[in-house]
Amino acid sequence: VVAQSGSNYNELLGQRGPNVITTAVPFISISPDARGGSMGECGVATETDVYSMHYNPAKYTFMKDRMSIGLGYSPWLRNLVDDMNLAYLAFAYKLNNESAIAATLRYFNCGEITYTDEYGTSHGEFRPNEWAVDVAYSRMLTDYLSGSVAGRFIYSNLTQNLVDGSSVGWSVAADVAVYY
């Protein structure tokens, strides 16, 4: 008896070859504050604070203080690499009881990396980095519902043009958020 299948033998064994993760600027998803990070990234469900831009900027209209400033520093993956870190600066200001503005600056330093070719020849050392600037406006829509619009500029310099065909990357993004 011969059985035939359309599957590749390696796929039947669960081996499909390299599975490269191609997430662009993954530093954007790292929680900037110790509280949110220690609670499993659940900052969406917490009380409004200056770090709300990362979770939902529509929360800013529910801020208790008129103005907040926050500064955060996280040594990232310290057990693996000793010089990779995330720095975060946040500012939020309630214009009145119904609206607020906020801005953040996020800087991610990948540490010092030695670039080599396929033969192991060194092509210099470099400190790859990425950063993003966010600006948001939030407005109360009802007593329990608010909305916001936010814009973001993203900069990524991971290779310093040391890799053929590579260049600095940058992008802009916009978000619309609702909070109930």
Predicted stretch roles:
Residues 4-180:
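Subset of outer-membrane beta-barrel
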